[in-house]
Amino acid sequence: MNNEETFYQAMRRQGVTRRSFLKYCSLAATSLGLGAGMAPKIAWALENKPRIPVVWIHGLECTCCTESFIRSAHPLAKDVILSLISLDYDDTLMAAAGTQAEEVFEDIITQYNGKYILAVEGNPPLGEQGMFCISSGRPFIEKLKRAAAGASAIIAWGTCASWGCVQAARPNPTQATPIDKVITDKPIIKVPGCPPIPDVMSAIITYMVTFDRLPDVDRMGRPLMFYGQRIHDKCYRRAHFDAGEFVQSWDDDAARKGYCLYKMGCKGPTTYNACSSTRWNDGVSFPIQSGHGCLGCAENGFWDRGSFYSRVVDIPQMGTHSTADTVGLTALGVVAAAVGVHAVASSVDQRRRHNQQPTETEHQPGNEDKQA
């Protein structure tokens, strides 16, 4: 690919009009939460900056991040791959394989040393000297370190690369390890989720290309624009949570009415992600809207925290409109308040059900005549 070609030149070559290009820039600004006023700056960057070479490598993973990325709609994955960046190496998507693919890998990291972005999907297992994950005939950890050495920045795609995910579940026999525990001398942005939201993945790349830097992150390395609030904060069922209206079983009347799924194990109150605002499948829905509680797949350690259907009792990151950076100091008080709210809500709910039941007097023989 010609990396000196700009994004705008690539789009024009594909027959995209100037008007459509500007509409694309406006949409990109909106998806990044920057407002329409930033569209001209994005347009200037995409008109003048050459496409950035990207090397995308895979460790221990299931490829769900790639599957998610190619379904991006804002912007389209094809626009990102063919125009916005130069995805020169991805052994899942590229046509080449085997020795030919590895020659491309070596050429890119040598020719663009210090200029390319390294995207990592999956994590390196450190057990048995890395032999649990072999890439190109050698342990993946070696490939990761070699690729990271010349990268300008690193994107950790998904919960596997960010936290370890199910591969790191106790007792973690392969010693699966998040990449930031192995690569410590490069800027790393974490985009957790199993998988991450497609449009979030595309937006992160668009931001980096436009502004030549990583987006602002929280103390855990996640971009604040997408991981600054909990799913619970913008969930459309939040009003039912505040009112103490909860689903008690999957087939009860509350479930049919769309009440809060907290008591069914929903991890939305402790999970930072954009599911409730960005949604999935081009904004169609997200798990809670489909009737199932959040699994908390974007959070560190979700795989070792018991059943998906167990109610969250200990909420270490509680805070109504706080980010992960600020909730720690207030978590204890908020947890106590939350316990009180649920106790009151449950009491009110039980009293309401009791009042709806007929009394014993109403069922006594002959009582109908007395009431008449």
Swiss-Prot record:
[4Fe-4S] cluster 2 binds at H232, C235, C260, C266. Its EC number is 1.12.99.6. It is an enzyme of class 1 (oxidoreductase). One of its GO terms (biological process) is anaerobic respiration. Residues 347-372 are cytoplasmic. Binds 2 [4Fe-4S] clusters. One of its GO terms (cellular component) is [Ni-Fe] hydrogenase complex. GO terms for molecular function: 3 iron, 4 sulfur cluster binding; 4 iron, 4 sulfur cluster binding; electron transfer activity; ferredoxin hydrogenase activity; hydrogenase (acceptor) activity; metal ion binding. It catalyses: H2 + A = AH2. Residues 1-45 form the signal peptide. Residues 46-325 are periplasmic. Keywords: 3Fe-4S, 4Fe-4S, Cell inner membrane, Cell membrane, Iron, Iron-sulfur, Membrane, Metal-binding, Oxidoreductase, Signal, Transmembrane, Transmembrane helix. It holds the Pfam family NiFe_hyd_SSU_C. [3Fe-4S] cluster binds at C275, C294, C297. It is a single-pass type I membrane protein. Its cofactor is [4Fe-4S] cluster; [3Fe-4S] cluster. Residues 346-372 are annotated as: Disordered. Predicted to be exported by the Tat system. The position of the signal peptide cleavage has not been experimentally proven. Heterodimer of a large and a small subunit. This is one of three S.flexneri hydrogenases synthesized in response to different physiological conditions. HYD1 is believed to have a role in hydrogen cycling during fermentative growth. Belongs to the [NiFe]/[NiFeSe] hydrogenase small subunit family. This is Hydrogenase-1 small chain. It comes from Shigella flexneri. The gene is hyaA.
